[in-house]
């Protein structure tokens, strides 16, 4: 029987699950720290989504474009669902993801009541770019098409948000074609050296023209 999955917005209650997925999916030098994940879940949960494996399996009629290994659940109980993939992002004023986007404002926990746009790093609420920091899939569920499924749904969610002009990512050279299949365009080598990796800048442009 195909596994049943659902996607929902993440919250701080998902911190431990996100940390487990992130740590399993990336090398230590590249994985987001616990504090960075916490910051993103607290500061901009509307930009963070998770793919959950349900405890029950159903086969709804609207699951045609879900990977063959999974069906999209519509009315199954999600009580015991397990996070198997996530997307974590912040807003940025830059057209591409920068090292400043990945940093944390000083004393951010104590300054949560202050306007976010006063910070020079991290979440920039007036930014038109969604800086995607992590598309992470649990290793035991990789190569099943689940990452692309989550990402395609995430793009739809971002289209529905106000003042989102683009989604930008840093990715490995060998994953450029993966993101091109999702509609991202390669801009070239990134100025970021996060984790000591030669990253590539890629951008998905959101069509803001009305129908």
Task: Say what each PLM segment does.
Residues 60-136, 140-142, 149-152, 157, ...:
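Conserved acyl-donor/pantetheine-binding loop and adjacent beta-alpha core of acyl/acetyltransferases
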Residues 1-36, 43, 47-105:
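Short amphipathic alpha-helix that is part of the acyltransferase structural core
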Residues 46-48, 197-203:
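Short hydrophobic/aromatic beta-strand or adjacent loop that forms the aromatic wall/cage
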Residues 6, 164-167:
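Short active-site oxyanion
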